[in-house]
Amino acid sequence: MNAVSALDADEAHGAPRARRIGALALRLAKAALDTLYPPTCLACRAATDRHGALCPRCWSAMRFIERPFCERLGTPFEHDLGQGLISPQAMADPPAFGRARAVARFEDGPARTLVHRLKYSDRAELARPIASWMARAGADLLADADLLIPVPLHAMRLWRRRFNQAAALTAEISRRTGKPCNLAALRRIKATRSQVGLSRAQRAENVQGAFRIAEGAGVRGLNVVLVDDV
């Protein structure tokens, strides 16, 4: 064995040791962080066993949307009548988009609490867990996607909120899935009133003419997934 091979052997034996030391350092750092900032539930702030999680009670209260649901609108069915079904609503009034998916029913409870904190309380760190649920719920859409685009805020609303929660979610979904995103491809050119409390027809009328594709966005011919929080 020459000097070079001996050195290589020493490095080979040292690599696992370095990894063990690194793993130990990470565990110690995590323990110190948990002591200073104990992990709490994202929704109710009850104690949890790790950061970025829901407590068992809030997790049970999340009304995740699972199949069976309308393949077009993503709205859940009361009974399982088979795969690939379209709801009467989607057949009577077909939407302009191809398919929609949602994580959970947006009712009083953890889902509403998390979205409101992300939107109105500067809790940008909530984008990570919410985006992970969105990536799971929209897996079939994401599999066919060429590009992810967030629903934009009007400049005045963006100034008041300081960040666009849909853009934060889009960026995180892109990071998780490897799908490319363009956070500036769509522009909101008209200020609109809040969609809260509006019917479907009123919502459509409210946003009529409010959006425009940015010049040079290059989305023609692409399969685009539009991302929003609600």
Features from the language model and the residues they span:
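Glycine-rich phosphate/pyrophosphate-handling loop used in enzymes and phosphotransfer proteins
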Residues: 1-230
